[in-house]
Design a protein with these regions (language model features):
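Alpha-helical transmembrane segments and immediately membrane-proximal extracytoplasmic
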Residues: 1-629
């Protein structure tokens, strides 16, 4: 049975908002990953959804079920939640719920934000409410990373480091491809020579990233596993992929290219036979057809139409340098392969961490504590992965259009340079502790290839909106989660109310029992006190004690009687307990000792029979007999 069975609602609500967050991530973060491929017309939205369905699931289920630290590590000090882990779980529910709404809003406006930063912003929000500014790790020294700080400062730095690094790398890669291949007279032949090396590099980067990040925790159970071993295995896999490309992929690609293009590189237009055209009246759609049309709307949107309707975007695309279409066609298959690697690595490296909030909620519910490491169950991975795919399929077109069409002109060669540079920068940065974000990296990469067309090759208005959305994510999410979390933690709670009443009743009953036992002992000393045989317990002291005990017992009983007192302060309950313990400490034979109370006699026995009695005086008890077993 779960330790916190009363909080099963957190798991239920958490599962729903986790699915919603996965949906929002699919519409925003995963759509961003496919933006270059769809924007360059290498893939259609429908094809991107199919690839995501297969390889996102494969990466998540095969290599994504890693044992992760709580997602707050490095951002917030969660030790303040250890006494009340259910509050932390509630905070995660708030973060997922608000994060879902934020991802929907930003997706609507075509703004690409980081889903990880969204959750982190939520954690910052409820941590501040719970324990103030000290609960957040703003800038903590970490000699193992560069810059040598971790915490919120690393996120701020990623806004600048991520796009700048990938812009430089993407520009360099595309510059080399453009100079050495695209602008050469024999570009088509050179393209086939360059494809195997690019396949080798692409596979190595993505496999090394998967082995060192996505699957590291699983593979590290082998005591011989290390990053150097991961590098060698990645090299072997990459070489095999390159050989497979040479032996199988290139001949097939050459055959397909020759089928679509003539020897001069012009696309062969199929001849459409002329005939009679009959116009038929359009049949009304059935209910099923209407439902199908609505369900598939997200993959049928023409994201490239904006090039015709928006003059500024149209000018950017028209001004971009055009290359031989046949060469771009050859690179399109390399970009498809790169997109598959990217989405598989995303499933292996990101889905496991995305599942962190719901996994934490489930772990708290099961164990009643905050664990250092949490391994997401399969059902949690499935919830997140299904949400990702559905989000991409139903609402990913806005961000895909923004990243793949609005920001800069993309072609298969440009898109491949952007994807490869993103994977390369993330891999290198993760090894050296540089703060990066995949969302911000791909944005910088697209800008990098666009800048090779000059400053007018980039839609700077779109980029400024992007940058503003990165900055506002932490602020907006933090404030919104803080508001929702505050409403919950400062509102009356049925579950905690029952627990408080239980504690109050038990403490009050314990205190009343002590008073009752004390009073019984006090009555047994009355005759000796009246006879002035007890120097430490004269009649006046006995009377005062009797009055005090009787009054205190009645008062304690009334504290938990709703007919008398409806609201009880904790100090009143504990004050009564402390008073009873004080009386025991100062006025019982535990403290005074038998000989001090009445030397040579049983002080609690009537003097008339004291000489003939051997019975011992009763000793006061602190706990009821049923609790002493």
């Amino acid at each position: 049975m779960a330790e916190l069975a009363g909080y099963v609602w957190l798991v239920v609500v958490g599962a729903f908002v986790a699915f919603g967050f996965g949906w929002g991530t699919g519409a925003n973060d995963v759509a961003n990953a496919f933006g270059t491929s769809v924007g360059s017309k290498t893939l259609t939205l429908r094809q991107a959804v199919i690839i995501a369905s297969i390889f996102e699931f494969a990466g998540a289920l095969l290599l994504g079920r890693v044992s992760t630290n709580t997602i707050a590590s490095g951002i917030a000090d969660i030790t303040s939640f250890t006494r009340e882990p259910e509050v932390y779980a509630y905070g995660m529910v708030c973060a997922l719920g608000v994060g879902t709404i934020w991802l929907i809003i930003t997706s609507y406006y075509g703004l690409n934000v980081s889903s990880t930063h969204t959750i982190i912003g939520g954690i910052i929000g409820f941590a501040l409410v719970w324990d103030g500014g000290d609960a957040v790790m703003w800038a903590k020294r970490d000699p193992g990373s560069f810059p040598p700080y971790k915490g919120v400062i690393s996120i701020v730095l990623s806004w600048f480091i991520s796009p700048l690094l990938t812009a430089a790398v993407a520009a360099l890669i595309f510059f080399i491809v453009r100079t050495c291949v695209l602008r050469q007279r024999n570009a088509y032949t050179l393209a086939f020579w360059t494809l195997p090396p690019f396949v080798l590099i692409t596979v190595f980067i993505n496999m090394f990233f998967v082995f060192t990040k996505g699957a590291k925790k699983t593979l590290s159970r082998d005591s011989n596993w290390s990053d150097s071993k991961a590098a060698w295995i990645s090299v072997i896999v990459a070489v095999c992929a390159a050989l497979l490309c040479i032996c199988v992929a290139l001949p097939l690609l050459k055959k397909m290219a020759d089928r679509h293009f003539d020897h001069n590189g012009n696309r062969i237009t199929p001849i459409v036979p002329r005939g009679d055209y009959n116009i038929h009246p359009e049949e009304p759609l059935s209910s099923w057809q209407k439902f199908k049309k609505a369900a598939t709307h997200g993959v049928d949107v023409d994201i490239h139409n904006i090039v015709k309707t928006d003059d500024k975007i149209g000018d950017i695309h028209d001004a971009a340098e055009k290359f031989e279409e046949r060469v771009e066609y050859a690179f399109s298959y390399l970009q498809v392969f790169s997109a598959i690697c990217v989405i598989f690595a995303h499933g292996a490296g990101e889905v496991g961490y995305m599942a962190g909030p719901l996994a934490t909620i489930w772990d708290v519910y099961q164990k009643g504590q905050l664990s250092k490491n949490v391994t997401p169950p399969v059902w949690i991975i499935l919830i997140c992965a299904v949400g990702l795919v559905i989000g991409l399929a139903t609402y990913g077109y806005n961000v895909t259009q923004a990243m793949g069409v609005k920001l800069a002109k993309l072609t298969p060669t440009r898109g491949f340079a952007a994807e490869l540079s993103t994977a390369l920068v993330i891999m290198i940065a993760s090894q050296y502790g540089l703060p990066t974000s995949s969302s911000q990296c791909i944005t910088g990469a697209i800008i990098g290839v666009g800048l090779l067309e000059g400053a007018k090759g980039v839609n700077w208005n779109q980029f400024l909106k992007q940058f503003a959305s990165w900055v506002s994510t932490l602020l907006v999410i933090g404030l919104a989660v803080a508001a929702v979390f505050s409403q919950g933690v400062y509102a009356p709670s049925k579950i905690q109310g029952k627990e408080v009443i239980m504690y109050e009743d038990r403490v009050a009953n314990l205190t009343t029992g002590i008073y009752k036992d004390f009073n019984a002992n006090l009555q047994s000393y009355k005759s000796n006190s009246d006879a002035l045989l007890l120097p430490t317990l004269p009649p006046t002291t006995w009377a005062d004690l009797n009055t005090t005990v009787t009054s205190a017992a009645t008062k304690t009983k009334n504290l938990v009687d709703p007919k008398v007192t409806q609201t009880t302060d904790v100090d009143q309950i504990l004050g009564s307990l402390y008073q009873s313990l004080s009386l025991l400490q100062n006025y019982t034979i535990f403290t005074l000792g038998q000989s001090t109370v009445f030397p040579g006699a049983q002080a609690c026995i009537d003097p008339a029979v004291a000489n003939s009695s051997t019975a011992a005086c009763r000793s006061p008890t602190l706990l009821p007999k049923e609790l002493m077993k």
